[in-house]
Amino acid sequence: MNAPKQANISISTHFDSGAIEVVSLADPQDIQLNIRADQGVNGAAEFAQWFHFRLQGLAGVPLKLRFLNAAQCAYPKGWEGYRVVASYDRQLWFRIDTKFNTAFDASSDNKVMTATITPDTNSIYFAYFEPYSYERHLDLLGSAAESEHVQSEFLGHTIDGRDMNVLHITDASSNEANKKNIWLIARQHPGETMAEWFVEGFLERLLDVDDPVSRVLLAKCVFHVVPNMNPDGSIRGNLRTNAAGANLNREWQAPTMQRSPEVFLVRQNMLKTGVDLCLDAHGDEGLPYNFVAGSEGNPGYTAKIEALENAFKASWLATSPDFQTAHGYGKTAKGSANPTLATNWIAQQFNCLAFTIEMPFKDNANLPDAGVGWSGERSKKLGAGVLLPILSVANEL
């Protein structure tokens, strides 16, 4: 029997959120790659950090992936303590050994991130974080809409022609007066896929007919959920921008249909429904913790909002070991907030409680998992758990 021929070696990105630039595949111990900048209809944007690609043909061969431009990416500190995620079946994602020089020198052009693995099969995927596909996004919308408590509303189209939808969720049979309007938006920055995993966990629990927390909240509140604010950027394999090259979380003060239709359409719907609480789910490249950022820098920040913030955080601390308040962005002086950010604009416009929720690309340093780090499943658990702090403040909103 003849020995099988050596498989062809290739790297491909022609799939949802695929992104990498191949410099050299000549040596398995020196696979040279560049992390590709965000891409839009007008060419490259300023951000580069997301990658997602498939490598074929090297089963049983020790590999070293060298990301040559890691030090020139948008958040080079994000590589310190970071480990690449990999998968054979695109279902189970695990972390692999990764190194980056922690003595970072911005003036140097030779700081390279390296990742090593010996693949079990001839096909393996690598990514910055566990991907969340557009197909799964559509499945999430479809499964949620099957609930009697959910109405899916079409808001309009993105620049690439994709649908923007919001899920309106409440117990219509409840006779509760003056229901509170609670918004959850996610993935303004498309490479922050943990944000949509967070929403998936949130929706699964909110729509669980046997969950007492969900039943009470659906009687008291109307939820408005946008699982993916940036579907174009998601499919294009972008870290932070949409198809027009816009960073959506800098568009809230004056969005346009030409540059940021996603924000324009959602903001328009918020003005229609009102907002009593808004959560904006994100991922942070550098900090290995889950945390929130509030609106204390707004000129309209009040003692009531501060009290609500403290109650919300205290409840989350008491109910989730994955949440903490010791590490975060620090406080912004009152009157110095950036009004183009969603949390700041919403809190100021509606005089309400608003948080940016940040999850790590790395791991939760307070509760690490050596196998998967922070992951899609852990993001889902955190999303399900946020219902408790919402319940703790619902009567005071």
Regions found by a protein language model. Name each.
Residues T102, A106-D160:
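Extended acidic/polar, glycine-enriched regions
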Residues A74-G81, R136-D139, E176-N178:
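A short, polar/proline- and glycine-enriched secondary-structure boundary/capping micro-motif
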Residues M1-I124:
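Extreme N-terminal flexible tails
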Residues N366-L397:
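His/Asp/Glu-rich mid-to-C-terminal helical/loop segments that flank catalytic regions of hydrolases
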Residues H149-D171, E176-N338, N344, F355-E358, ...:
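Active-site/substrate-binding loop(s) of hydrolase catalytic cores
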Residues Y75-P76, A127, Y134-H137, E192-M194, ...:
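Short helix/loop capping segments that flank catalytic or ligand/cofactor-binding pockets
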Residues V112, E262-L265, L382-G385:
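Well-ordered alpha-helical segments embedded in enzymatic catalytic cores
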Residues F350-L353:
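Short, proline-enriched alpha-helix->beta-strand connector loops that line the catalytic pocket
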